[in-house]
Swiss-Prot record:
Cofactor: Mg(2+); K(+)
Originating species: Lactiplantibacillus plantarum (strain ATCC BAA-793 / NCIMB 8826 / WCFS1)
Enzyme class: transferase
Keyword vocabulary terms for this entry: ATP-binding, Cytoplasm, Magnesium, Metal-binding, Nucleotide-binding, One-carbon metabolism, Potassium, Transferase
Protein name: S-adenosylmethionine synthase
The record's free-text note on cofactor binding: Binds 2 divalent ions per subunit. Binds 1 potassium ion per subunit.
GO CC list: cytoplasm
Binding site for K(+): E44
Annotated function: Catalyzes the formation of S-adenosylmethionine (AdoMet) from methionine and ATP. The overall synthetic reaction is composed of two sequential steps, AdoMet formation and the subsequent tripolyphosphate hydrolysis which occurs prior to release of AdoMet from the enzyme.
Membrane spanning residue stretches: none
Metabolic or biological pathway: Amino-acid biosynthesis; S-adenosyl-L-methionine biosynthesis; S-adenosyl-L-methionine from L-methionine: step 1/1
Quaternary structure annotation from Swiss-Prot or TrEMBL: Homotetramer; dimer of dimers.
Superkingdom, taxonomy of origin: Bacteria
Family to which the UniProt record says this protein belongs: Belongs to the AdoMet synthase family.
Length: 395
């Protein structure tokens, strides 16, 4: 048994500069996939005061009005007022998109297996890059996610909803939340120790109003009352003022919130970001597949928690390795789990794309509030439709 300990995770709102960039990149990806499901897309975005830069590599038959997609995305987030130092109607938008490198394309279009004479059509697509990707699930929340990141996302979704429906009129789009959970000797969540929430606001609202409103209408409205006690600390706008925010306050860049996007630091991360990438990029698709595996393993009762690692070589279809770690909670051996995974999940890029139906415009909705454990949207890698097949292996 371990001693009681604290664990902290954070989330950020859709108006955070890095998340604006993620959403623009994924909105462009979606617009291309809507016209051309085979599009190869790797789009990065940078945002700063009054300026958006879109750059990367694309191979597609689609025609997309990038300027319109960028401006519509910014306005939908809530940047519609020039007083914010950044708004969708008046910012400059610069675009520099090249074609995908033919050196990369030849390995993705025709994998090593295909070039070696393998006739299986699902061997056709080689991995778009080398790397390792992780998926994780744990049974401490209904969505099988770690509690600290799940609660942090809930806070951010709530404050965005209150801003967008006009309930709290002085809110502006940029915000961050951080939740510290105390775990007991058996590694079970015991209580919430600290909540940090910083939100951008209009200049004419006082700090006491901000703090009391956020505690009452956001924090206590969202967090489980049985985990809050008189020792829980609430730190709301602890700098005292947060008027300048969004891209005016900090430059933003696609792919800088990879821990917010995943498990809040509870599990390993391979380093690759998701947004702006089509599903031939295993940074994205294999991370989704690894979560799909992990969630089904835990939902099947085969472990209380599991971390799955997949690794790929560029231009090769089959993963070079599969590893699992149940942290001692497995009801079967890790080796047996790996065999069951190989039997029930096709982890070649084309197999993942087919299994999870990934050549669709479904990505913009993932670019804020996390890619995993989402209860507000339907994502194929969150389905638990492999539970019966996994259980059958161990009957």
């Amino acid at each position: 048994m371990s001693e009681r300990h604290l664990f902290t995770s954070e989330s950020v709102s859709e108006g955070h500069p890095d998340k604006i960039a993620d959403q623009i990149s994924d909105a462009i990806l979606d617009a291309m996939l809507a016209q051309d499901p085979q599009a190869r897309v790797a789009v990065e975005t940078s945002v700063t005061t009054g300026l958006v830069l879109v750059f990367g590599e694309v191979s597609t038959k689609a025609y997309v009005d990038i300027q319109k997609v960028v401006r519509d995305t910014i306005k939908s987030i809530g940047y519609v007022d020039g007083q914010y130092g950044f708004d969708g109607d008046n910012c400059a938008v610069l675009v520099s998109l090249d074609e995908q490198s033919p050196d990369i394309a030849q390995g993705v279009d025709d994998s090593l297996e295909t070039r070696s004479g393998d006739a299986d059509p699902l061997d056709q697509i080689g991995a778009g890059d080398q790397g390792m990707m992780f998926g994780y699930a744990i049974n401490e929340t209904p969505e099988l996610m770690p509690l600290p990141i799940a609660l942090s996302h809930r806070l951010m979704r709530k404050i965005a909803a209150l801003r967008k429906d006009g309930t709290i009129k002085w809110l502006r789009p940029d915000a961050k939340a951080q939740v510290t959970v105390e775990y007991d000797e058996d590694n079970q969540p015991k209580r919430i120790d600290t909540v940090v929430l910083s939100t951008q606001h209009d200049p004419d609202v006082d700090l006491d109003t901000i703090r009391q409103t956020v505690i009452d209408q956001v924090i206590k409205a969202v967090l489980p009352a049985d985990l809050l006690d008189d020792q829980t600390k609430y730190l709301v706008n602890p700098t005292g003022r947060f008027v300048i925010g969004g891209p005016q306050g900090d430059a933003g860049l696609t792919g800088r919130k990879v821990i917010v996007d995943t498990y809040g630091g509870f599990a390993h991360h391979g380093g690759g970001a998701f947004s702006g990438k089509d599903a031939t990029k295993v940074d994205r698709s294999a991370s989704y597949a690894a979560r799909y595996i992990a969630k089904n393993v835990v939902a099947a009762g085969l472990a209380d928690q599991v971390e799955v690692q997949l690794a790929y070589a560029i231009g090769v279809a089959e993963p070079v390795s599969i590893a699992v770690d149940t942290a001692g909670t497995g009801k079967v051996s890790d080796e047996a789990l790996i065999n069951a995974i190989r039997e029930n999940f096709d982890l070649r890029p084309a197999g993942i794309i087919k299994m999870l139906d990934l050549q669709r415009p479904i990505y913009r909705q993932t670019a804020a509030y996390g890619h995993f454990g989402r209860t507000d949207i339907d994502l194929p890698w969150e389905h638990t439709d492999k539970v019966d097949a996994l259980k059958a292996v161990f009957k």
